[in-house]
């Protein structure tokens, strides 16, 4: 008796491999390219946009679908395509069907966790973007995220030595 077991399977392909990957210069370009995806959705959906060092878009992957007011996911699920594609940068994008682009406390916590997890994999979490109708906003620009980067994250970074091991 034999069987095949797949731990996970991810189908990664480009529609036309002969075309060079799109280079993302700013948030507006990324939002313009994907906001149509969110039109008419009545629940929150998270996308992971993965890029290389030159900001070439390697792919956009659906991470999770949630309810009308929230969505849950595992950071490993969001980062798996980036790891498999050899990406060095990632941007999370999700929608707010309510039309309010203000980040919730959960949105800020998600952005913090993604920032740390991506860093541990030698990747850069460039932003976490919220799209609501024709508007969008950056969680990384939110005052609570900024305070965390300036204060708490600096303290975490000081706990690490140059060789990456925690010190006492």
Each model region followed by its residue ranges:
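Conserved beta-strand edge residues that scaffold enzyme active sites
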Residues: 96, 130-132
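Beta-strand-loop-alpha "switch" segments that mediate conformational coupling across diverse proteins
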Residues: 127
């Amino acid at each position: 008796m034999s069987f095949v077991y797949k731990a996970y399977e991810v189908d990664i392909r480009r529609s036309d491999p002969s075309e060079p990957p799109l280079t993302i210069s700013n948030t507006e370009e990324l939002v313009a390219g994907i906001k149509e995806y969110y039109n008419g959705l009545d629940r929150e959906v998270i996308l992971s946009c993965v890029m290389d060092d030159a900001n070439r878009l390697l792919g956009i992957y659906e991470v999770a679908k949630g309810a009308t007011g929230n969505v849950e996911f595992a950071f490993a699920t969001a980062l798996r395509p980036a790891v498999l594609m050899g990406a060095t940068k990632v941007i999370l994008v999700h929608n707010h069907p309510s039309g309010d682009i203000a980040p919730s406390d959960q949105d800020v916590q998600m952005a913090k966790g993604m920032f740390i997890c991506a860093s541990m994999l030698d990747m850069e979490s460039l932003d976490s973007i919220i799209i609501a109708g024709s508007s969008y906003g950056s969680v990384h620009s939110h005052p609570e995220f900024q305070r965390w980067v300036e204060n708490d994250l600096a303290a975490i970074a000081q706990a690490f030595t140059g060789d990456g091991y925690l010190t006492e």
